Each structure stands twice: as structure tokens, then as C-alpha cells.
Regions:
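Acidic, polar ligand-binding/catalytic clefts
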Residues: 44-113, 186-187
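Short acidic, glycine/proline-rich loop/turn micro-motifs
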Residues: 13-18, 82, 111-113, 191-194
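Extracytoplasmic small-molecule ligand-binding "clamshell" domains
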Residues: 1-72
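Periplasmic-binding protein-like
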Residues: 7, 92-102, 127-131, 165, 169-229, ...
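Short, well-ordered beta-strand segments
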Residues: 2-5, 99, 118-120, 161, ...
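A ligand-binding cleft/hinge motif common to bilobed small-molecule-binding domains
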Residues: 57-58, 72-84, 130-133, 154-155, ...
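Bilobed "Venus flytrap"/periplasmic-binding protein-like clamshell domains
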Residues: 9-10, 22-39, 76, 97-146, ...
Length: 239
């Protein structure tokens, strides 16, 4: 099973720097392993895993072109994407926040505080759309991966990063100079659903994926993975 992903999106997917093969690990990879396990049981043969770790933009193109079997990349199932791919049930819901330098946090009490400021985001993501459409008067810097967006913030090239709260946690643990500010995003964009994408026309596979998601949710595995991989990511990021 070929999995498209974009490492650097902790705790969903990131490179394990302690592994000899620089394996991609995280919440999404753990969920992918469960899907492979269920698919192997159904087919009666061992299904192998191949991870195509590129960029989020390349991931989207690969799924739309039916070049991969599945995309696990902390992705939101927005209507625009549904034209080119099918989505699983939602397996995680998270709040969208703005991460800033702790020293500047007091000046950001609402989204209007970011007028004439620079916001860094990951390219072709929900967060990019939020920055472009819901933050008045900001300049948007789009990077291929979220660590590069965070680097813009820590090197004073950006004033904030629109980021999912789950993804922010490893950075906040590893760097006490960063915080989530008090400014709340508009209600219609504040919360993000996360789902799995597959090429169109794979209804049976999608059904198996949804069964796996429900089993993992019922067993509390997804929450467990978030805690586990946030901790690992923070340790590696700090190191």
C-alpha cells in the first residue's frame, strides 16, 4: 500500500531521527499501520507499506492522479478537494490557532491586532486559506512544510503562524519562547476536521478505512497516539 504523506507535520507525521532509515512516524503512520493490518486480514496476504514522503502539494496531485493508494497527511476534507478525491470519515477534530512569540503575545488580543503583520503558513493548506481570507490586512508567507513556517516566526521574519492546536503542541513543548495567542479565529474557520484521502472510485477500500477509524476511536488509540507522538516529536525537536 503506497501512502502519500508530508513529514514535518508533527505529531501527524515526522521523521524519526533516531531510526537508521529515517522512518516517518506519527499519528497518521500508526493509523496507516492499522489499515494495512485490517487489509491484510481481509485479503489473506501480508500487505507491504511504502511511504512516499514529499510535500503536501505533491501529495494532493498524486492522489488526484491515482498514483498512490492513500494520503495520510493531517488533511481537511474541504469541498474543493472532494472534486478530485474521496475522503474517509473524520478521525480527528482540532482547533485552529495563531502561534506567536511569547514576548509579543500581549499585543495580540483579537485578529484585528494582526493588521499589517506577516503570517506564515504551510502552502496549499486550510491554514493558508484562513490567513488569506479571514485575517484582515495581513501579509501571508507560504512555505512547503510547517517547520519552515515556524522558522519564519522564530527568526522574526513572521509575526505569527496559523497552526492546528494539535500540531502546535510539540513546538510549544520544545520552545518556551512560543505561545498560542488569545486572538480567536472566526467561528466558521476555527475548527478543522481531519480525514484520509483516497483516489476516486475505491468504495470498498474506503469502507475498510472507515471501519478501522471507528475501531481506533472506540479503543481510544487516536488520543493515545496524539499524546505519544507529541511527546516524541517534542523531545526530538528540542534535541
Amino acid at each position: 500500500m503506497v501512502i502519500a504523506t508530508a513529514s514535518g507535520y508533527m505529531p501527524y507525521e515526522f521523521v524519526d531521527i533516531t531510526s537508521s532509515n529515517q522512518d516517518v512516524i506519527g499519528v497518521d503512520m500508526a493509523l496507516g499501520d492499522k489499515i494495512i493490518e485490517k487489509l491484510s486480514d481481509k485479503l489473506g496476504v501480508e500487505v507491504k507499506k511504502k511511504v512516499e514522503d514529499t510535500t503536501f502539494t505533491a501529495n494532493l496531485a498524486a492522489v488526484a492522479a491515482d498514483q498512490v493508494d492513500i494520503m495520510l497527511a493531517g488533511m481537511s476534507p474541504i469541498e474543493e478537494r472532494k472534486q478530485n478525491m474521496d475522503f474517509s470519515d473524520v478521525y480527528l477534530k482540532a482547533e485552529q490557532r495563531i502561534m506567536v512569540r511569547k514576548a509579543d503575545a500581549d499585543q495580540y488580543k483579537d485578529i484585528d491586532s494582526f493588521n499589517c503583520k506577516t503570517i506564515a503558513v504551510q502552502k496549499n493548506t486550510t491554514q493558508e486559506k484562513i490567513a488569506q481570507n479571514s485575517l484582515p490586512g495581513v501579509s501571508v508567507t507560504s512555505m512547503e512544510k510547517i517547520p519552515l513556517a515556524v522558522l519564519e516566526l522564530t527568526t522574526n521574519k513572521a509575526d505569527g503562524v496559523v497552526i492546528e492546536s494539535t500540531v502546535a503542541q510539540p513546538y510549544l513543548i520544545a520552545n518556551t519562547d512560543l505561545v498560542l495567542c488569545d486572538a480567536e479565529l472566526p467561528e466558521d474557520v476555527r475548527y478543522k476536521d481531519t480525514a484520509i484521502a483516497v483516489p476516486k472510485g475505491n468504495e470498498d477500500f474506503l469502507e475498510l478505512i472507515n471501519e478501522t477509524i471507528k475501531e481506533c476511536q472506540d479503543e481510544g488509540l487516536i488520543d493515545q497516539w496524539i499524546e505519544e507522538y507529541s511527546s516524541i516529536a517534542a523531545e526530538q525537536n528540542a534535541g
